[in-house]
Every structure is written in C-alpha cells, then in structure tokens.
Amino acid sequence: MARHSELVKIPRLDRYVSKLALGSAPLGGLFSEVTDLEAEETILAAVNSGINFFDTAPLYGHGNAEKRLGAALNKSQKPYVISTKVGRVLKKFTPEEVAGKVDGLAAYVGVDPTIFPVFDFSKAGILKSLEDSLQRLNISSIDIALIHDADDQIDQAIAESYPVLDDLRSQGIIKGIGVGMNFCSYATKAVKQMDLDIILIAGRFTLLDQSAQDELFKEC
C-alpha cells in the first residue's frame, strides 16, 4: 500500500481514512476555472489511487465544489468519508448588493455572481448550512462537520455552533465534529473548550511554517 493511501482510524467515528485527503477548494474554481469533467476526473483519480477522505465546504466555488464532489463520489461506488464545513451560509443577492463583498468572491472563478457566502455561526445558520450541504452533496448524512474560519469569532463558535453540532452528533445525524482554522491560538482554544474529533489547520504545518507542531499539536 502506498503511503498516501495508508489508513488511520478516527476513533469516535470508527472509520478509517487515508493519510492523504483530497481538498476540493481548487475544484470549486479557486483562482482558475475548472470544468465539471476536470473535477470529476480529479476526484475519481484520487479514489482509484486509494484516497477515501475528501474535504469540502460551501465556500469552495460557492457550492460548486460540494456539487461536483457528491456527483463524482456517487459515480465511484466506493466507500468514502466526507468532511464539509459550517459557519457560512450561501445567500442570493442582487449584483448591486454583492458589490464590495470580498469573502472569497474574487478568489473563485466561474461562480454565480449572485450567490455569496455569509458568515453565520448561530444555531439557525449551522442547521441551514448542513441542510444545504446535504442537498448539494446528494447524501443523507454528514461524516464530519468542521466549524470553518471561526478564528475571529471563536467565542460565538464555542457558545452557539458547537452545542448544536454536539447535539446532532449525539443523535447520529453527523458522526464527527472538528474545526477548520487558520491560526493556532484559536484552534488551540477550540481544542480546550470543545470535545472535537478532528482538527484542520491551514498553513501552519508546512516547510516554511511549523507553528502548529509547537503549539496546537501539543493539545491534541
């Protein structure tokens, strides 16, 4: 077995995932346009190489990445684990209303210019985000829900987002809870104050920046 496809267990989920996951931000058209066929071929190539763990979010392509990921995995007919994210809800705006909004809009190419992601860490926002993701992915349940980019709103995420996710986990509606963060200090606070199954930290464990190893990993 190739190292990228070696499996590790996420304990409470009782699921084994490949050590290497496929992130789907580029499949949503991050910085350059991606066709449905290109996205499908990429996802199926990952599946055929032994990868079974796929990460997505409503932000990625403003829903396009989730739609493409769900369609391709449905074609593959192989078992998989999906993590998607909560904390943003996609809303419809007029072009005039969208003008001046910057949260990810300029980064994604080929998206509907009237659909825009809006931060919402409230209970209602979390439930709406999950409901919409289930529809876009065309699946009946979510393996892992990650609270997304709550670095500047970590207190609200702890007080409002986490309790509803914990309740859904206890009901079996979602299997695992995590955070997808950008800064170690906020992720560390999340680890200390929430009962999490998994942590995604962006850009803090690379060749250039290994701050997660010194700060966050010690708490995991």
What are these regions (language model features)?
Residues V17-A21, N52-F53, P79-S83, S141-L146, ...:
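Structural preference for beta-strand elements that scaffold enzyme active sites
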Residues D132-Q153:
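Active-site groove signature of glycoside hydrolases
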Residues H4-L7, A150-C220:
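Beta/alpha (TIM)-barrel catalytic core signal, keyed to glycine-rich beta->alpha loops juxtaposed to Asp/Glu
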Residues E33-A46, F119-L137, N182-K189:
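Short, acidic/polar
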